[in-house]
């Protein structure tokens, strides 16, 4: 007699297993749906951070499953496919960390490790505060606004701010470039004429270099003139 045990599930066992864990599966899928659908920095920072954590977990999970597939391949063809996919997952994960670390060295912001983007916007206020925000791509124009004394850019709340705190230049950093935006227009005041209550600023892309924000912050007061 064979001592091997058949570990495969038949249809009825699969149905029973689903019935037993269907509540957990429903809750898990609902959690993923909410995270992926509503996880935007402009809506809720908390849900957005949860979304980032979920995305971070996907790469190690893919690598782990790939390694298991290499250890227990269904056949020779499956082994080759598992090796290729696992190597691709490992290279992609390493590439993500390399690019994120390069971006972090350039702008010193934890947004550098955002798996959705390889760009970070930075506004160095004249009061010494640095405001960083997530941005999906390098735009041609940036339009930060001040509403009720709070600074917003790309729909994201950044800091408590007054109109005269905005600098002449703001930046969007990528792993290999620093994009410089210069203020070209400024509108202050609301319908009541209160210039501190509402303000709109227009920054146009001026130049591109390979500098870091730290060199700008310590380079003198010319940035704020």
Curated annotation (Swiss-Prot):
- Variant or mutagenesis effect after changing residue 35 to L: In strain: Isolate IL/2831/98 and Isolate MN/6370/97
Q: Which GO terms describe its molecular function?
A: structural constituent of virion
- Keyword Lyase, does the record have it? no
| Resulting phenotype, residue 62 to I | In strain: Isolate KS/5425/99
Impact of changing residue 17 to F on the protein? In strain: Isolate AR/6386/97
Result, substituting residue 2 to A: In strain: Isolate AR/6386/97
Main localization of the protein described in the UniProt heading: virion
GO CC, any one term: viral envelope
- Listed as disulfide-bonded, the cysteine pairs are none
Origin, by domain of life? Viruses
Pfam families per the record? Answer: CoV_M (PF01635)
Positions in the Intravirion compartment:
42-51, 99-225
Q: Which family does it belong to?
A: Belongs to the gammacoronaviruses M protein family.
Describe its partners and assembly state. Answer: Homomultimer. Interacts with envelope E protein in the budding compartment of the host cell, which is located between endoplasmic reticulum and the Golgi complex. Forms a complex with HE and S proteins. Interacts with nucleocapsid N protein. This interaction probably participates in RNA packaging into the virus.
Q: What is this protein called?
A: Membrane protein
- Specify the species: Avian infectious bronchitis virus (strain DE072) (IBV)
Q: What is the lineage of its organism?
A: Viruses, Riboviria, Orthornavirae, Pisuviricota, Pisoniviricetes
Q: Which gene encodes it?
A: M
């Amino acid at each position: 007699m064979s001592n091997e045990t058949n570990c495969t599930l038949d249809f009825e066992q699969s149905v029973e297993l689903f019935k037993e864990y269907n509540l957990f599966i429903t809750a898990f899928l609902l959690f993923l749906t909410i995270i992926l659908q509503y996880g935007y920095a402009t809506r809720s920072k908390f849900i957005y951070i949860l979304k980032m954590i979920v995305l971070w977990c996907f790469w190690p999970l893919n690598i782990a499953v790939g390694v298991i597939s290499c250890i227990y391949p269904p056949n020779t063809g499956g082994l080759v496919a598992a090796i290729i996919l696992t190597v691709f997952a490992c290279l992609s994960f390493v590439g993500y960390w390399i690019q994120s670390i390069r971006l972090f060295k350039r702008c010193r912001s934890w947004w550098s490790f955002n798996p959705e983007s390889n760009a970070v916007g930075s506004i160095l206020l004249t009061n010494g505060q640095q405001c960083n925000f997530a941005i999906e791509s390098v735009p041609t124009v940036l339009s930060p606004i001040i509403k009720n004394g709070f600074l917003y850019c790309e729909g994201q709340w950044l800091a408590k701010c007054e109109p005269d705190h905005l600098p002449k230049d703001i930046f969007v950093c990528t792993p290999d470039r620093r994009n410089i935006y210069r203020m070209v227009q400024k509108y202050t005041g609301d319908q009541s004429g209160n210039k501190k209550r509402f303000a709109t600023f227009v920054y146009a892309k001026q130049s591109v270099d390979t500098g870091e924000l730290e060199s700008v912050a310590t380079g003198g007061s010319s940035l704020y003139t």
